């Protein structure tokens, strides 16, 4: 209890401090009320001018803290004049918490949108841009349109960033004081900005301050989903079809084992024997059969662990992922690692080609790049540890403006799902007769349709809100609080939407919320409850459970089943006890703990790629922003030459290999005959460097003389092509390394440490290959002046296609190099490049 008391005391202390500062804002109400509209806008200009004279971000933040009461008072007065709404004290407190870079946890209906206007205005005064982030484009559009009235009144500009906007429109949106956008679009724009060829093609400014609405949904629920920009990879889809046919033949327990708790599925020995016969291979687990076993495992996952209308839907011949937290489909998103193709094979729709990742980032790493990050939501306290550890954000529970009157009733648990759903329908019928509006929450699309059919049989008119008809969301939600309304909704039930009570509903007990199953996350259950009882309204909530629910099957239903059997309870008799609720909450905590651990592991692995991505993007940006790229090229020429001397000449064990060294120099830098063995034999390494460097320098100058003012554009083109080509291959190689790295634990190795070490080695090899290619293309390309090198057009990202540096050539995919394989220096390199080992990964 000591730890819990500390948390509660900490929140109470924070609330008192916020309350005192909010009182200072309210105290300025009369003084602000006498200002004219023009005087308010002049105040904004004054703040902006004073902040523009401060070039240090920390000093700017100190100044913002100083003017906070006056700035917030201006926003309150502006809101009063524009919307005829004055933010309450609790909203001011929430706004202060957000300005501090924390999360304001505010109940549904407490006015988070208006709360955010105060910290948004204050931080936008610095002129560095504020991003207000919502979970979907509909909310971004609505909020930007509504709030622009207030911000324009105060003298600030507002932009809206949508996926459909052109590059110019996006750039203009980001240039405004305040920009509304979705988290997805921000992440993709960041990746695109780091794939352009010219600085003027970028759309974003440096990331300064972000306020995330429904912050738990974006930073927790979506943290494990990376944003990926990809191009198609040429690969046959026939193996998916074969694996699908094979998976359909298999029987559980005989041919494969399935663990419902972990959702892991794998072949038994009998299943492996069948696979060897079906695919005509001697040993399924031989290295050369890795593709076969990978496709079989993926097909098994598609058939056993994923259900249609629960995990995905098929719409117009296309497989669409269903977001497990919102119930919405996610057009454009695809399962990775071939799983989407396996589902397409399972459902008999066209199998689309696999894609090759060109750029990727997780939300965890994207949002940690902001100077300051804050958020608001109705449900965050259960995930406070994760917010603190990963994002350095504290969760502050803001009091409600009016006391909560909702009655949260104990869970009712039934033996079977049939008994549960019968009871749910009876409850709905009873409430409907009285005229009380009912909101039924379901976890899956198929459940919502099942209940809908039961209600139809009883003659109850109702609306269904799920991924299949989400376009009517606003209309359905608007009517959900009216007398006699019955609404069935998946978890999408209104993140960012308010259910307002109709006339006479308060007297009937307000909105009744019925949950038909517990979600694995307590936050999602709390969000469903929170649809009722907004702003002091009456309401009630209750969850109906059964021992056949997925969460109960995965965790602890056996004990309850024995207990219910001893009591002699039948299908129609529920248990209502604190023990049941505690057991369910305990199961949820275990799932949440597992998910947190998984997100932490992802972050640890992603940290390796984050550092590498930072180096590559910085390198690209410096090439784009520098007017003269010759210094970069010069450094690459020198380091590549020095590396070759260290390898061929400075050998501790062997005699210097003069001829192989000359062959390498001729391949990368010079023409045959430019350097002979007589030129370098008997000389030490330093002298050899000087002799060869003089020749390279002359060849480099010769290219400059031919191309003259076009040389810089030529170098930039070669550098960017080389970086992009090798970086794309490197991402693919790192992905392959990561997919199999967990198997190292069976050999008592540390998978994360191995991934870090080998990832570092692969990155070093990639950087060397970039330098080699750049040197070779710049010195060995035959370019005529009349070729008139034109500026390359930046890749069209809308189609997520990327033009390779060597159009028309089929790229050889690098194979992982297994340590311990004895490869001769003159043997072909096992990476598959076609070069000798000593000239490739043997350097």
Curated annotation (Swiss-Prot):
GO terms for cellular component: cell envelope Sec protein transport complex; cytoplasm; plasma membrane. It is found in: Cell membrane; Cytoplasm. May bind 1 zinc ion per subunit. One of its GO terms (biological process) is protein targeting. It is a peripheral membrane protein. ATP binds at residues 91, 109-113, 498. Residues 799-813 have a biased composition (Basic and acidic residues). Its cofactor is Zn(2+). Its EC number is 7.4.2.8. Its main location: membrane. It catalyses: ATP + H2O + cellular proteinSide 1 = ADP + phosphate + cellular proteinSide 2. One of its GO terms (molecular function) is ATP binding. Keywords: ATP-binding, Cell membrane, Cytoplasm, Membrane, Metal-binding, Nucleotide-binding, Protein transport, Translocase, Translocation, Transport, Zinc. InterPro entries: Helicase_ATP-bd, Helicase_C-like, P-loop_NTPase, SEC_C_motif, SecA, SecA_CS, SecA_DEAD, SecA_motor_DEAD. Monomer and homodimer. Part of the essential Sec protein translocation apparatus which comprises SecA, SecYEG and auxiliary proteins SecDF. Other proteins may also be involved. Part of the Sec protein translocase complex. Interacts with the SecYEG preprotein conducting channel. Has a central role in coupling the hydrolysis of ATP to the transfer of proteins into and across the cell membrane, serving as an ATP-driven molecular motor driving the stepwise translocation of polypeptide chains across the membrane. This is Protein translocase subunit SecA 1.
């Amino acid at each position: 209890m000591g730890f819990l008391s500390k948390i509660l005391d900490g929140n109470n202390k924070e609330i008192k401090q916020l309350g005192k500062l909010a009182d200072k804002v309210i105290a300025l109400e009369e003084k602000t009320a006498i200002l004219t509209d023009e005087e308010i806008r002049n105040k904004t200009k004054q703040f902006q001018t004073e902040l523009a004279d401060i070039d240090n971000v920390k000093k700017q933040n100190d100044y913002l803290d100083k003017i906070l009461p006056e700035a917030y008072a201006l926003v309150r007065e502006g809101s009063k004049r524009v919307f005829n709404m004055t933010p309450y004290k609790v909203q001011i407190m929430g706004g202060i918490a957000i300005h501090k870079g924390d999360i304001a946890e505010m109940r549904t209906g407490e006015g988070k949108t208006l709360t955010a206007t105060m910290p948004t205005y204050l931080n936008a005064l610095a002129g560095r841009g504020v991003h207000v982030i919502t979970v979907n484009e509909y909310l971004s559009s609505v909020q930007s349109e509504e709030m622009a009235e207030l911000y324009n009144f105060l003298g600030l500009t507002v932009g809206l960033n949508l996926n459909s906007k052109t590059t110019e429109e996006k750039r203009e949106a980001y240039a405004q004081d305040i920009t509304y956008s979705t988290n997805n679009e921000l992440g993709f724009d960041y990746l695109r900005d780091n794939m352009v060829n010219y600085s003027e093609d970028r759309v974003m400014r440096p990331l300064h301050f972000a306020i995330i609405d429904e912050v738990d949904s974006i930073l927790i629920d979506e943290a494990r989903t990376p944003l990926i920009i990809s191009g198609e990879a040429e690969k046959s889809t026939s193996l998916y079809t074969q694996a699908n046919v094979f998976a359909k033949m298999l029987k559980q327990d005989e041919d494969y084992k399935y663990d419902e708790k972990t959702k892991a599925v794998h072949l038994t020995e009998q299943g492996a024997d069948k696979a060897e016969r079906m695919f005509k291979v001697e040993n399924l687990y031989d290295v050369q059969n890795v593709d076969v076993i990978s496709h079989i495992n993926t097909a098994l996952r598609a058939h056993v662990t994923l259900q249609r209308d629960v995990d995905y839907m098929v719409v117009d011949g296309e497989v669409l992922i269903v977001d497990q937290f919102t119930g919405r489909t996610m057009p454009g998103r695809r399962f990775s690692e071939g799983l989407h193709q396996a589902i397409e094979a399972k459902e008999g729709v066209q199998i689309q080609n696999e894609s090759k990742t060109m750029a990727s980032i997780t939300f965890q790493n994207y949002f940690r790049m902001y100077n300051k990050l804050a958020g608001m939501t109705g449900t965050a306290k259960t995930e406070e540890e994760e917010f603190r550890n990963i994002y350095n954000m504290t969760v502050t529970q803001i009091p409600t403006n009016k006391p909560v009157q909702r009655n949260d009733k104990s869970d009712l648990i039934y033996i079977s799902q049939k008994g549960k759903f019968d009871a749910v329908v009876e409850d709905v019928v009873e409430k409907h007769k009285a005229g009380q509006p009912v909101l039924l929450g379901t976890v899956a699309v198929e459940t919502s349709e099942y209940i809908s059919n039961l209600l139809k049989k009883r003659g109850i008119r109702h609306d269904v809100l799920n991924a299949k008809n989400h376009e009517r969301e606003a209309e359905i939600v608007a009517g959900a609080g009216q007398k006699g309304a019955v609404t069935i909704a998946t978890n999408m039930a209104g993140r960012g939407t308010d259910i307002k009570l109709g006339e006479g509903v308060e007297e009937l007990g307000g909105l009744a919320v019925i949950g038909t199953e517990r979600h694995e996350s307590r936050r999602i259950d709390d969000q469903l409850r929170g649809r009722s009882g907004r702003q002091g309204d009456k309401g009630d909530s209750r969850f109906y459970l059964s021992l056949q629910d997925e969460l109960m099957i995965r965790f602890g239903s056996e004990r309850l089943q024995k207990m219910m059997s001893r009591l002699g309870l039948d299908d129609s008799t529920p248990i209502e006890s604190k023990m049941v609720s505690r057991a369910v909450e305990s199961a949820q905590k275990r799932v949440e703990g597992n998910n947190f651990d998984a997100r932490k592991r992802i972050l640890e692995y992603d940290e390796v790629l984050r550092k590498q991505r930072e180096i590559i993007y910085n390198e690209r940006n410096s090439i784009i922003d520098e007017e003269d790229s010759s210094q970069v090229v010069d450094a690459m020429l020198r380091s590549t030459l020095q590396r070759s001397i260290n390898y061929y000449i400075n050998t501790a064990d062997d005699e210097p290999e003069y001829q192989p060294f000359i062959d390498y120099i001729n391949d990368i830098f010079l023409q045959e005959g430019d350097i002979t063995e007589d030129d370098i034999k008997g000389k030490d390494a330093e002298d050899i460097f000087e002799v060869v460097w003089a020749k390279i320098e002359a060849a480099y100058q010769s290219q400059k003389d031919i191309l003259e003012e076009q040389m810089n554009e030529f170098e930039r083109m070669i550098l960017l092509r080389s970086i992009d080509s090798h970086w794309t291959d490197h991402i693919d190689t790192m992905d392959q390394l990561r997919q199999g790295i967990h198997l190292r634990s069976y050999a008592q190795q540390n998978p994360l440490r191995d991934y870090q070490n080998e990832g570092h080695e692969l990155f070093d090899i990639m950087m060397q290959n970039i330098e080699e290619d750049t040197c070779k293309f710049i010195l060995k390309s035959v370019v005529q002046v009349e070729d008139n090198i034109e500026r390359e057009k930046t890749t069209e990202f809308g189609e997520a296609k990327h033009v390779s540096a060597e159009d028309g050539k089929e790229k050889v995919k690098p194979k992982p190099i297994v340590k311990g394989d004895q490869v001769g220096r003159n043997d072909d390199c096992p990476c598959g490049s076609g070069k000798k080992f000593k000239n490739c990964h043997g350097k």
